[in-house]
Amino acid sequence: MTAKVPRITMSGDTIVFNPEAFKLKEGARLDELIKKLPGVERRDGKLYWNNKPIRMMMNGKDLFGGDQIIGQLPAEVANKLKLYDRKSELARHTGNDDGDEDQVLDIQVKPGFLDKWYGDVKAQYQTKKRYMFEGNARKLSDHDPQMLYLQANNANRYIDKTMSSTMNSNIDGDGKSQYGSYNYQHNWHTKGTSQYSNNRFDISANLGHYDGWNTIGKSTETFFPNKEHTFAVSENYHYKHNIKPQMEARLFAYTDSVNTISVTAKASYEKSRKTNEDKGASYGYEPNKFEYHSLNAALAAKPGDALYERLITRNRNYQSSEQQDRNLYVDYAWEHFIGKSGSFSLKGYTQISGNDEDTHNNRDLEYLREKRSETVWQFYSRDNKELTTKLGATFEHWLGKKVYVNITDNVKYSRTNTTRDFFTDNNKQNVVDGTPTTLDPNNIMSNLMHTWTNQLTLKSTITPVKALMIMPKFSWNVNREKSDYRYGQLDTTAVRTSQTYEPSIFLKWKMSRVRNMDLSFAYNTTVPELVSTFGYRNTVDPLYIYTGNPMLRNSHSHTTTYNYHRMWLRKQIVLGLSASYNKDINPIATLYSYDSSTGVYESKPMNVKGGDMWTFGLNYDQGIGVYFRLMNKFALETAKSYGFLTIVDNNDPNAVPELNLQKRLGINENFEFSYEAEKVQLTLFNRLEWNRYRYDNASYNTSPLYNSVGIDATLHLSPFELYIRLADDFRSGYATSAMNGHKLMSMAYVSYSFCNNKCLLSLHVDDIFNKDIMYDSDYSAYQRSESSANYIHHYANLSFTYRFDAKAKKK
């Protein structure tokens, strides 16, 4: 008989995952193993466990190259994976836990796998003449890790790999890129500091270039009182060319056993060229008589057509711009540890940046109710220079064994100088080589801003008993701003001094090795940008005018959150429960005014009555026997918020808008039931997103639903592997009719391994039935919008990968 290896064990307060307990194909990567760990999930490119971010380490050192590098390393290098709370540098000096800790997933590397090179080279061909070439090389070492990366593709991928992070994302809806980087780190220990963080020096140089483009369709409805409603449809095509070289160097070192220094220097330059083509139309409809019309139908409508009589505006805009960004950043810190009682540190940074932009606009506008049209040529040149520097001091001290105190004071100064020259012409005779020559006095802008900020923070960790930590915190912020501001006819000098107070408290209770909970409360104040409180009037877009609001006030919020975590090791169950409450006070919303004769909107920021939101969550993960796994992530939200109904045909600046209440009930669920054997893996899944919106004006009520139910199947018949995914994606309740209904989503993948699994030939077919499209939606108490975007799908690609994984030395 062969004993079953448990997936999870405990060693003190450390959770230990055993790689042998997980079904992996030969040659699998580390990320494939980590995805299978109970409770671990990836969101927005980052790893989380029990809804808390994970800091990746290897043999107790930060993983050189960041989280994404685990996709290049073979899973067989891992002897154990340990999940634990890593104490702060101060805690390791004093022996007292100050509560400042990171949740770490530490990969323990098997003997014989260090000081070797790992990597791969990949060549890919994709239908419609797309390609990708990629090369990774990484030296796995505790002392001198290195990383080299090169790629070129026209398959819409931008991959950026540096010593601290990795980005792998779509460029846009379509695109091409080239990128290269080299990264080096040297690690060592100062005598007498082996129990603390290692000294390290890093250097990185990289150069990236990309071209990206996309077409986005959008529909927008701004909420009106019980009058004629309006509905706007638009389409935007954009293109961007970008090149960005950058260099970075970092140093952290113990000069002796009680002093550390750290320095980071980073320099970058970025140049981009952009074009935008916009088409749009708006039409009116009576309440409860909505009928969707596409943009093409609106643009094609002619006098006599029923739709033409309802049209309000149509527009076609073309924009081109060139932009340069320069940035130099240096931060520095010194910390001195005072025996077993605390530490004193000085920290600061200086940043110098500059930006300049030249932009041309060409607008064709139709005001159908006024039976007139116009063409507008615009050009502006914008220049921005900024200097920011900050210096702070921190004193940390333990009052006995149970009370820790931290006092920090930071002083920051910034100087920003922004200027914009603006030219506008309606007469083509004044346009020379596409550039207007008449100065537009209404949109010339300049702003010289000086900001002084002092932030005093007092925080503490109180440990009445070993298992309980109480961590109160209080911040006092004093902000003084001076602005010499000009926009059109507005020419003013303003000085504002603001003070904000931000209290918070965090309670953490480790009831046992397998049970813990935390409770937190935080109160925040947001001061509106000084410029938004000026009475400026931006008429760059004749159809959408933006203004400031001198009556704008501070907004506030407070959030209370509770988390509970429990494990049953023998039953291989991980359970997480969460609840939170958020209250907004005087939040800032957008108030729209509308002229029904021209179809022109005017907007300004305005404080609105506050709302609140309750959120409840359940995360459940269980291994059932040797082969089965059940996972469910469920969240319930109920929220209330307020917005303003649009003011229609009322030019009185003191007009009082009507409040509109939005009530939202939301359910999100991610369910998986999987079977994992050596040769077969099957997963049944269901993803649910449902929101119920209710308004004071019932004609705006809606309940959008998205549900995806399907199956993932993987078959391993060495040297072949086959993967198939089928899902029914269903949407309903959207104003854009094309978004609603069932869509059969599908993809398939087959691979062939040879040369002792060093070579991999694979064929991937995406969206076999050509049903996919990218949708997005946003609903507020004053507006709702829905959009769709193009991206690469319905393709086949053939790729070849060669891996040069090192093998452990035989003893």
Per-region residue spans from a language model:
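Short, acidic, small-residue-rich periplasmic hinge/interaction motif at the N-terminus
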Residues: 1-23, 42-44, 51, 84-85, ...
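Extracytoplasmic
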Residues: 12-14, 51-53, 76-78, 100-104, ...
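Short, polar/charged loop or turn motifs at beta-strand boundaries
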Residues: 14-36, 50, 57-66, 122-127, ...
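Periplasmic plug
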Residues: 43-91, 104-111
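Primarily recognizes Gram-negative and organellar outer-membrane beta-barrels
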Residues: 62, 66-67, 87-129, 144-751, ...
